[in-house]
A protein has these predicted regions:
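Alpha-helical transmembrane segments of multipass membrane proteins
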Residues: 18, 22, 98-103, 204-205
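Extracytosolic (periplasmic/ER-lumenal) interhelical loops and adjacent juxtamembrane/interface segments
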Residues: 31-57, 116, 124
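Alpha-helical transmembrane segments of multi-pass membrane proteins
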Residues: 16-33
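Residues that define the loop-to-transmembrane-helix transition and helix capping
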Residues: 9, 50, 86-89, 167
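C-terminal transmembrane module of polytopic alpha-helical membrane proteins
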Residues: 1-7, 13-19, 177-260
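Transmembrane helix-loop-helix
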Residues: 52-149, 184-200
């Protein structure tokens, strides 16, 4: 654990502590932390402003948190080392918030489609009980970034004995999540998983990576010559400014001592 980069280490610690504390609070005091901190529909009485942030630190069961934290450990640690703690934390949180936003949009569409079939009371009751928890949205964003930055890295999927490139795995996951989400929307395959939130994490991760690229941020391993030229010019310019500043100070000191 000590060898892990800073943000990855604290994300793992925070998620596991919150998971076990929420279980203790529910069993011993009857406090449902998932109902308080989980993401609810924005127009329901159960919604609170902190939920788009807190929901990504809550998990339904042990397998839920283990799979998410395994991905944080495998892929997040690499991004944490490559980007640095500050940039990686920003990316993780943005992906989680983006996943929450997409999930809210999906709920809005679902509830509007129910208007022709159900009465207002039934819709309000259904909206009140809509809840999403888990770091999966942020994790899918992390997976997307790994495939974006290290596309040719060989990876293995369970029950498939051959290595698959990271970019291919990201595409496969995105397609599976899209079809599963559409199945939930149409009622052909309901599995109580926020598939569109996963896609939302990927989408907002992609948008953030594009924003960083357009603002002259370079991915690890890039050999873009123009970036290197600009960096070299910036270094020479800063060095020239430091030399000019030193000369001015020496000149002022010389005339000061001369007057004395």
């Amino acid at each position: 654990m000590r060898n892990l980069p800073t943000v990855t280490r604290y994300l793992l610690i925070a998620n596991f502590i919150i998971f076990f504390l929420s279980g203790i609070l529910e069993r011993n005091f009857g406090i449902d932390v998932n109902a308080i901190g989980g993401l609810h529909y924005y127009n329901a009485h159960s919604f609170h402003w902190w939920q788009p942030f807190t929901y990504m630190f809550l998990h339904a069961n042990l397998s839920h948190i283990l799979f998410n934290m395994l991905a944080v450990w495998m892929f997040g640690a690499t991004l944490d080392n490559a980007w640095g703690s500050r940039r990686y934390l920003i990316y993780y949180i943005v992906c989680g918030l983006g996943a929450a936003f997409i999930q809210e949009c999906v709920w809005s569409v679902m509830l509007s489609n129910m208007a022709d079939t159900y009465d207002a009371f039934s819709i309000a009751h259904y909206a009140y009980n809509l809840t999403t928890i888990g770091a999966s949205g942020a994790v899918f964003g992390v997976l997307f970034a790994f495939g974006w930055l290290f596309p040719d890295t060989p990876m293995f999927i369970l029950f498939i004995p051959i290595p698959i490139r990271a970019r291919t795995i990201v595409i496969i996951y995105a397609i599976v999540e899209l079809f599963a989400g559409m199945g939930n929307m149409m009622g052909t395959h309901i599995d109580n998983v926020a598939h569109f939130a996963h896609l939302g994490g990927m989408l907002f991760g992609w948008l953030l990576l594009l924003y960083w690229r357009r603002n002259n941020w370079r991915e690890p391993g890039s050999s873009e010559w123009w970036w290197k030229v600009k960096q070299k010019c910036r270094e020479l310019f800063n060095r020239h400014q430091r030399l000019d500043s030193t000369k001015e100070k020496d000149y002022d000191n010389y005339h000061y001592h001369k007057r004395l």
